[in-house]
Regions:
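Extracytosolic (periplasmic/ER-lumenal) interhelical loops and adjacent juxtamembrane/interface segments
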Residues: 56-100
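Alpha-helical transmembrane segments of multi-pass integral membrane proteins
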Residues: 142-196
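N-terminal signal-anchor transmembrane alpha helix
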Residues: 30-71
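Hydrophobic alpha-helical transmembrane segments of integral membrane proteins
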Residues: 119-159, 215-217
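N-terminal intrinsically disordered, low-complexity tails
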Residues: 7-29
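Hydrophobic alpha-helical transmembrane segments
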Residues: 100-121
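Membrane-interfacial loop-to-transmembrane-helix junctions in polytopic alpha-helical membrane proteins
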Residues: 31-35, 92-102, 127-134, 162-173
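Short, highly charged, low-complexity non-transmembrane loops/tails of multi-pass membrane proteins
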Residues: 199-217
Length: 217
């Protein structure tokens, strides 16, 4: 009776059975994932620094130029026409120009870099396509809504007095950006903490010294 390749390998060695030796087999390259992890660390660190600078430092300093009034971007629960009217009365042209410049610099860089970092985080940790797109949705929406909110807030404070509809839109965008930022952070945690089987990550089967998996022995 003819012997199987596994039996031949056990008796005469892997070479006799035509099975490549595990020691000589090329190991799977981990360079792409290592490069991705390095990019992720750099992008995430930049996003955290920008968040701290933009929200905690720069917008706080802008409040000092508005008689202590909170900037609309920092009002998690939204705002009304009365608050915008108070801001318009308290801020001169120089202060409004500084806020607009802040929106165009740090206020633009933060959502873009945060979005890139979170997309990469999910890409590296989730292989199941439908789950990946589900987790990608909040950071994509956050970046779009945050950029739109910057324009809406600048429009409220510059030019003629805004109507109630403009204020309601800008307020809704502000609330939405904070909600989406929170959902994005939750999605990032899920991408890392969910079980590998849920994320579609298939563990590599251990290979024995004869190049045989556990199932073939």
């Amino acid at each position: 009776m003819s012997k199987t390749r596994a039996q031949i390998a056990r008796k005469h060695g892997a070479a006799a059975a035509g099975i490549p030796d595990a020691a000589s087999a090329p190991a799977p390259s981990t360079a792409p994932r290592s490069n991705g992890n390095m990019l992720l660390i750099a992008a995430a660190a930049t996003a955290v620094l920008l968040f701290g600078y933009y929200h905690l430092l720069a917008l706080g300093q802008m409040s000092q130029l508005a008689n202590g009034l909170t900037m609309p971007d920092m009002m998690f629960g939204g705002y009304g026409a009365a608050h915008i009217a108070d801001l318009r009365a308290a801020m001169d042209e120089d202060a409004l120009g500084q806020l607009s410049y802040l929106h165009k610099t740090a206020g633009t860089l933060f959502p873009l870099i945060f979005g890139i970092a979170w997309l990469l985080l999910i890409q590296l940790n989730v292989d199941r396509r439908w789950l990946r797109w589900l987790l990608w949705l909040p950071p994509l929406l956050f970046a779009a809504v945050d950029l739109w909110e910057n324009v809406a807030v600048d429009a409220l404070l510059a030019g003629s007095a805004p109507d109630d509809g403009q204020v309601a839109l800008a307020s809704a965008l502000t609330v939405a950006r904070w909600v989406l930022l929170g959902l994005s952070c939750v999605g990032g945690l899920l991408a890392v903490l969910l079980p590998a089987t849920v994320r579609g990550k298939v563990p590599v089967r251990p290979v024995g010294p004869a190049g045989l998996t556990a199932e073939s022995r």
